Amino acid sequence: MSQPTLFIDRDGTLIDEPKTDFQIDSLEKLKLERNVIPALLKLKDHYRFVMVSNQDGLGTDSFPQENFDKPHNAMLEIFRSQGIEFDAILICPHKPEDNCDCRKPKIKLLKKYIDKKLFDPAHSFVIGDRATDVQLAENLGIQALQYHPEKLDWDLIVEKLLPKTTACERPPRYAEVVRTTKETDIKVQVWLDETGVNQISTGVGFFDHMLDQIATHGGFRMNVQCKGDLWIDEHHTVEDTALALGTALKQALGDKRGIQRFGFVLPMDECKAECTMDLSGRPYFKFKAKFKREKVGDFSTEMTEHFFQSIAYTLMATLHLKTQGDNDHHKIESLFKVFGRTLRQCIKVEGNELPSSKGVL
């Protein structure tokens, strides 16, 4: 039966991986990653767990089977004692030079799950600490969460996989906007009181990454799907996505009762990006940034200003943005990040009063 599934790496993700020899071949080396057990306990009612691991030279003189089995079985027993079970444990014992067809990121180990359609691609993930885990996810057609003990630990993974409503006493602040023209076909969904995995696909890779920065730093979740006339250029895709996203944010905010309304973030990152915002209902936009390059990846740098201008007018917000620095990629990214952080302040619910002496926003 197709169901949400987490394909989880072992070394460096579930348990610590020694940086000396990259082998857990004794009980002394066995150490669980921080908060992995509480995280898996929260996730187990929502996902099936499948362990997928490369173990270089397992069963050879360089890594005897019995040396692997002792800490591995001890790890499994710890998990079982806490009510955590794996549907399967799939291990490739080969070294890279063996050129096998089962070593991650190749997918032969998961043949049963693929052939029998046992996992739901829309709600399944690969969790691992290496680039090979990210590539495995791409080969499976699902998303990856690249574990990192500081940047994306198990607590954050749970937060992404189990969206939670932070304003339970209020109706969910959700909006869906569909915008179809001769140039683009767009669907935007926003959940202002949830965090989780953002599903974003516009056909412009750098732009997808920038949109994800808005939601991530804004503390909300969103899905953006856009099919545009990219055979011409990305202008309509970027502009129309901004218009749809601004409209969705405005609709999700409702009457704006209880929100903080104002937000500002002073210089952040190496690029010194600044943002001031007022969800005033009166659109105004001011932008100050200079770019040396015509494009960053597949994204025209001139579309940065146009994106924020478009979103300011459909969001009906006063927006001031500026950045300075040396690297155009970093400057653009800093603007999307600082916009997200400022928006996070503005949409935060503080009470039930309307933040306006006029009685309307």
UniProtKB/Swiss-Prot annotation:
UniProt GO molecular function: histidinol-phosphatase activity; imidazoleglycerol-phosphate dehydratase activity; metal ion binding
PROSITE patterns per record: IGP_DEHYDRATASE_1, IGP_DEHYDRATASE_2
Protein's cellular compartments: Cytoplasm
Associated pathway: Amino-acid biosynthesis; L-histidine biosynthesis; L-histidine from 5-phospho-alpha-D-ribose 1-diphosphate: step 6/9; Amino-acid biosynthesis; L-histidine biosynthesis; L-histidine from 5-phospho-alpha-D-ribose 1-diphosphate: step 8/9
Keyword DNA damage listed: no
Reaction catalysis annotation: D-erythro-1-(imidazol-4-yl)glycerol 3-phosphate = 3-(imidazol-4-yl)-2-oxopropyl phosphate + H2O; L-histidinol phosphate + H2O = L-histidinol + phosphate
Predominant localisation class: cytoplasm
Residues annotated to bind Mg(2+): 9, 11, 129
Keywords recorded for this protein, A-Z: Amino-acid biosynthesis, Cytoplasm, Histidine biosynthesis, Hydrolase, Lyase, Magnesium, Metal-binding, Multifunctional enzyme, Zinc
Region (Imidazoleglycerol-phosphate dehydratase): 173-361
GO biological-process terms attached to the record: L-histidine biosynthetic process
Family named by the database record: In the N-terminal section; belongs to the histidinol-phosphatase family. In the C-terminal section; belongs to the imidazoleglycerol-phosphate dehydratase family.
Protein name: Histidine biosynthesis bifunctional protein HisB
